[in-house]
Amino acid sequence: MTTLIHVLGSDIPHHNQTVLRFFNDVLATELPEQQIRHFIVASRDGISSADFPALRIETCVDKKTLAEAVIARAKANRNMRFFLHGQFNPTLWLALLSGKIKSEQVYWHVWGADLYEEASSLKYRLFYWLRRMAQKRVGHVFATRGDLAWYQQRAPRVPTSLLYFPTRMNPALTGMQVDKPLAGPMTILVGNSGDRTNRHQEALRAIHKQFGKNVRVIVPMGYPANNESYIAQVEGDGLALFGVKNFQLLKDQLAFDDYLNMLRTCDLGYFIFDRQQGIGTLCLLIQFGVPFVISRQNPFWQDLTEQNLPVLFYGDELDEALVREAQRQLASVDKHQIAFFNPNYLQGWRDALALAMGEPT
């Protein structure tokens, strides 16, 4: 009998908790236990099994310990299969490259960042080369439409399927009409976290150039931890450009309901990372009728256009009239049909897990 183990190979609490909650609360209610139950998770602080009673979770204190556990299982039982949720664990890539883990044992759901190559040092260039070679040996790849297109340029022979991250969304909010006030300054959300990939300072300068100082800017930087120096730089630039009255930097992570309430107040999002990132925040903005600016280098634009959603590209001319027109277009879309919204992404997960178990879909 095939055993399927889900692997969260890096200690990224906010994403890992979302996946575990989705499997425990949603998939466990409708799919066979053997498809959803077994998890190995990298977590220095541990995970309470009482929070996820439908799952059997083995925690490892770090990436290396987790990789060793996965490799040992893979070598002991070649019928065992592993579903990698994201993959930021170099030891696992090397194990796949060396044959310690076989291609047919690995199913990989891409989380965006693990496809892209941003660092330029010699050490990273060597790692990226090895990772590219390993990524060609995956048995089956799941990703967004844009990430699949990017991946297939380098690994055209690997089977692929469309699959979306299980964004935490309340479907009851999808059909709600959110009226945007036309009077007063626009409110612009910059970035989805404190990660430098958001290029916050560049975004702030671009917003100031396009709209002037009379817009309200919100910058959420509640994670990652130990980011005080960069936060201070962004805060200094933001205050200099927009002043205390119009610039708000959020240094603590908001509770989910508070985050939703904050998003509802926005007129525009500004996300100029050069990769697929922040789909959760983008989904919530779409749900509330808020258009956003993205980079042309972010392949998620392909998913947006496939769903007939307006796309505003970074670097193009932009003013308030164009923002209001994008809001109008977004309001006219039947959001219940959007493929990457809850519950529409559920069928992709049903098919993916059946495939990983070798069952018909």
From Swiss-Prot:
Which GO terms fall under molecular function for this chain's record? 4-acetamido-4,6-dideoxy-D-galactose transferase activity; fucosyltransferase activity
Main subcellular localisation: membrane
Q: Provide the alphabetized UniProt keywords.
A: Cell inner membrane, Cell membrane, Glycosyltransferase, Membrane, Transferase
Q: Which domain of life is it from?
A: Bacteria
The UniProt entry's GO biological process terms, in alphabetical order, are: enterobacterial common antigen biosynthetic process; fucosylation
Transmembrane domains' residue ranges: none
Task: Tell me what this protein is called.
Answer: TDP-N-acetylfucosamine:lipid II N-acetylfucosaminyltransferase
Q: Name one GO cellular component term.
A: plasma membrane
Q: Which organism is it from?
A: Pectobacterium carotovorum subsp. carotovorum (strain PC1)
User: EC annotation?
Assistant: 2.4.1.325
Q: How does it sit in the membrane?
A: Peripheral membrane protein
Q: Could you tell me what this protein does? A: Catalyzes the synthesis of Und-PP-GlcNAc-ManNAcA-Fuc4NAc (Lipid III), the third lipid-linked intermediate involved in ECA synthesis.
Q: Name one Pfam family in it.
A: Glyco_transf_56
Pathway info: Bacterial outer membrane biogenesis; enterobacterial common antigen biosynthesis
Q: Which NCBIfam families match?
A: PRK02797.1-2
- Intracellular or extracellular location(s): Cell inner membrane
